[in-house]
């Protein structure tokens, strides 16, 4: 079979990218394959081309409807729409039934399915009537608890592939370290797979890390986006509120509309934002990590992270959305020490008492009917667990992994599934091991991302080493990373003299009018708009300057207080609890 001709005839490409030919040859021959290629390197072709060339059906399991729709529409645009379809809950029942009928009739070559579909009653039985050749698990790192996006729905996929009699299994991911890749192989039961890990070097992307002070961060982001050829851009924020605030501030600073995108927006609004960005009607998106998967925009010139992501894998997947057209692009990561403290806080919060899996298993067993089926109120379980929805989802994953339950797709406020076995000593031991494994993995990811942030050596080489890509780093001259060229870190904009003067006036106002007099820490708390008992008891919230610097970090206010003391515009009394006072020449002014 002439794969190069097929590549040209079906996709219009003249030649394969590194690793693609080997993966396609193995898949066509019916060999298991593990493909690890970053976003934009063409990993989807490694299963699309073999699937289109074979005379049986290739099932592609993908975690997001947007991802599936994007690939189906792209193939349809190449004139292949009659051979490709998807089944999902957003389509009506008659459409899904028609797709399944076409699959049984042998009309389809690629069928896209969400992982939770295999838990739906009767779906696997209907799929048994179809001749399945290749079973593709896209975003395969989701099967590994060591991966950055672990999903319990992926547990059942190895069994589903075997039940369908698939000739070969293809695991595809953009972000898997060697450790995660081995775990993926084990959990999916890959047999002597061809391993392809390549393409992690993105020579057209210049990587940089900056360490701005809190008050410098947002002006620095605006400055980075004002440069020539800086747009379109994606700015990742750590929270929904942060995304909204950034969108507002950047709209004002840049003189063009920046749009917020996060999971708190309704589906229609998210779709509008996504369409406008894809059409270049809006060139700046301020988003949480809910944005990106399934968004195929080739001309993104800049990706900025306003805070440090939880793992190097997550960071590189998001940064890799820049420059997919091969043109010059930049990935800028802004890091503060408070990001590190937040990471530690969240990891510690994820640590789960070892009694909780048993508590949840008891509730499920009590609700199960004679056939083991259960329906529980998710909100009541969250309250009982003393955590949030993430804790509940994590525990359900541990119980699934231990073989106690099999979850079923359901509304967010319901926990639905089937009880498979008792929570006995064996299950308890498996859950303890799983819990320990998960926390160790999170600490490992913490160390890896902060090693990347704090290192002085080449960042591109560190990324390749992390993902097991042995290629020699290549880049455009002067555009590798800030370790190789310090000029790649944008200079913080000069401080706004008016803002500094306003802050100075506010600090001096507090020192002049607060009674009882306050120290530097309480001064910063007053200006930041704090609501502590001490502030309210002494009516500091009634001072003219109260809350006047709420947009600034307390640490930056404290730093300016210290500068005023050093310059002689403020003084502190002695004693164990020093307070601020004005020197005579300032008090008389």
Where on the chain are the PLM-derived regions?
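Accessory DNA-binding and partner-docking regions appended to nucleic-acid-acting proteins
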Residues: 1-3, 353-451, 456-589
């Amino acid at each position: 079979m002439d794969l190069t001709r097929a590549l040209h005839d079906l996709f219009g490409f003249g030649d394969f990218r590194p690793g693609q030919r080997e993966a396609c040859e193995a898949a066509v021959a019916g060999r298991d394959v593990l493909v690890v290629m970053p976003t934009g390197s063409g990993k989807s072709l490694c299963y699309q081309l073999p699937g289109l060339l074979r005379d049986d059906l290739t099932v592609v399991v993908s975690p997001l409807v947007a991802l599936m729709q994007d690939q189906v529409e792209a193939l349809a645009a190449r004139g292949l729409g009659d051979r490709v379809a998807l089944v999902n809950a957003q389509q009506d029942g008659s459409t899904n039934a028609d797709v399944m009928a076409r699959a049984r009739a042998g009309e389809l070559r690629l069928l896209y399915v969400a992982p939770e579909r295999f838990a739906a009653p009767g779906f696997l039985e209907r799929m048994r009537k179809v001749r399945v050749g290749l079973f593709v698990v896209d975003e395969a790192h989701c099967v590994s608890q060591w991966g950055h996006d672990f999903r319990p729905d992926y547990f059942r996929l190895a069994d589903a592939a075997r039940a369908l009699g698939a000739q070969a299994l293809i695991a595809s991911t953009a972000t898997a370290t060697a450790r995660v890749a081995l775990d993926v192989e084990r959990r999916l039961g890959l047999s002597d797979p061809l391993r392809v890990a390549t393409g992690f070097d993105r020579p057209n992307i210049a990587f940089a890390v900056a360490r701005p002070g809190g008050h410098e961060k947002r002006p620095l982001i605006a400055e980075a986006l004002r440069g020539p050829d800086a747009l379109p851009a994606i700015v990742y924020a750590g929270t929904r509120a942060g995304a909204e605030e950034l969108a507002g501030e950047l709209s004002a600073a840049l003189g063009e509309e920046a749009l917020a995108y996060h999971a708190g927006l309704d589906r229609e609004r998210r779709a509008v934002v996504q369409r406008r960005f894809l059409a270049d009607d809006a060139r700046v998106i301020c988003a949480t990590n809910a944005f990106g998967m399934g968004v195929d925009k080739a001309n993104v010139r800049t990706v900025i992270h306003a805070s440090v992501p939880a793992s190097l894998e997550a960071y590189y997947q998001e940064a890799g959305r820049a420059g997919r057209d091969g043109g010059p692009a930049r990935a800028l990561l802004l890091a503060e020490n408070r990001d590190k403290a937040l990471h530690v806080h969240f990891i510690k919060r994820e640590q789960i008492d070892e009694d909780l899996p048993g508590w949840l298993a008891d509730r499920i067993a009590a609700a199960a009917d004679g056939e083991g089926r259960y329906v529980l109120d998710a909100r009541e379980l969250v309250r009982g667990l003393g955590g949030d929805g993430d804790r509940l989802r994590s525990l359900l994953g541990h119980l699934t992994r231990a073989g106690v339950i099999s979850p079923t797709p359901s509304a967010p406020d319901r926990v639905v599934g089937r009880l498979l076995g008792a929570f006995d000593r064996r299950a308890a031991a498996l859950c303890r091991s799983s819990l320990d494994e998960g926390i160790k993995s999170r600490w490992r990811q913490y160390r890896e991302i902060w090693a990347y942030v704090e290192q002085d050596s080449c960042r591109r080489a560190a990324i390749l080493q992390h993902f097991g890509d042995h290629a020699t780093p290549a880049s455009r001259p002067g555009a590798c990373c800030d370790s190789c060229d310090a000029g790649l870190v944008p200079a913080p904009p000069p401080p706004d003299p008016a803002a500094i003067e306003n802050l100075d006036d506010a600090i001096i106002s507090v020192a002049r009018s607060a009674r009882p007099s306050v120290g530097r820490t309480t001064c910063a708390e007053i200006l930041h708009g704090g609501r502590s008992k001490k502030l309210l008891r002494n009516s500091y919230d009634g001072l003219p300057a109260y809350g006047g610097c709420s947009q600034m970090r307390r640490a930056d206010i404290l730093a300016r207080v210290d500068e005023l003391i050093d310059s002689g515009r403020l003084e502190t009394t002695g004693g164990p609890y020093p307070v601020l006072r004005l020197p005579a020449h300032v008090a008389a002014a």
